[in-house]
Amino acid sequence: MKNLFLIIILFFAINANAQQGFVMMNQNKVEFSNQGKAYKIFDDYMNPIWNQLVDEGMIISYSMMTHAWGDEWNLNYMIITKDHASFLKAWSEGFKRIRSTVPQEKWDELMRYTLEHKDNLYSLRHHYDGKKN
């Protein structure tokens, strides 16, 4: 039993050391005719808030990805943090700021444009940014 406990501890220690960050990928389906309007709401309201959290050091990076050609998930954003706990803290702070600054009519408008969304949470196993530690 003692050996099993040590193996479990070792397994989690190896996985924790292998993790190089935490990624949240939010994907949204927006009707083609409303893409530009949805992108503008992000540009005007959401992107500046997530960018602030990067500048404040709460998150490592924030990216918004869009396309008009490919699959139906055409408005996507990604947040990278150092770990899951940091993500939860940044997510809470980000949405607190979003809900306090985005006018309700703009929030409702974005929700009307969003046909469906999904969130994926990943442990970042490898990331290279070219910076020397």
Language model segments and positions:
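N-terminal targeting signals for Sec/Tat export/insertion, comprising classic cleavable signal peptides
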Residues: 24-58, 63
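Short, solvent-exposed loop/turn and secondary-structure capping segments
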Residues: 39, 75, 88-92
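An amphipathic, aromatic/His-enriched active-site/gating alpha helix that lines ligand/cofactor pockets
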Residues: 45-48, 52-60, 80-125
